[in-house]
């Protein structure tokens, strides 16, 4: 039997040279791997799920976005800045694809664990949730 999972929330990534790619179910990869492109921002449509987010942005540092509302932009648009590290709180797990390292292990969105790097000038290229 095939198990069909409903999306807990939707993600719309903003990628270097491509802009907004389009909303997709959170289980899909949001971003582009293998092409040396930075994930600059993303929007989450929470679909009733409570999600809190923090992001470490090139040249800015940590930004706390609190509880995410539909169309909250996490990151920057039009500034050419890379997302470097993310921290989420919610009922899901996530992983990120980091420049030169590939995919991290899955981690629970507990509001403490971070995925990515700080102080190494490495870009996050994609993110995935489950």
Regions found by a protein language model. Give the residues of each.
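Lectin-type carbohydrate-recognition ectodomains
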Residues: 1-130
């Amino acid at each position: 039997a095939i198990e069909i999972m409903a999306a807990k929330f939707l993600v719309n990534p903003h990628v270097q040279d491509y802009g907004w790619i389009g909303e997709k179910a959170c289980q899909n990869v949001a971003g582009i791997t293998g092409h040396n492109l930075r994930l600059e921002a993303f929007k989450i449509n929470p679909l009733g799920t409570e999600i809190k987010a923090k992001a470490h942005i090139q040249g800015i540092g940590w930004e706390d976005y609190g509880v995410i509302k539909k169309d909250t932009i996490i990151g920057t648009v039009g500034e050419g800045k890379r997302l470097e590290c993310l921290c989420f709180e919610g009922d899901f797990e996530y992983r990120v694809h980091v420049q030169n390292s590939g995919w991290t292990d899955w981690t629970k969105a507990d509001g403490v664990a971070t995925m990515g790097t700080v102080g190494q000038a490495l870009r996050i290229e994609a993110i995935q949730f489950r």
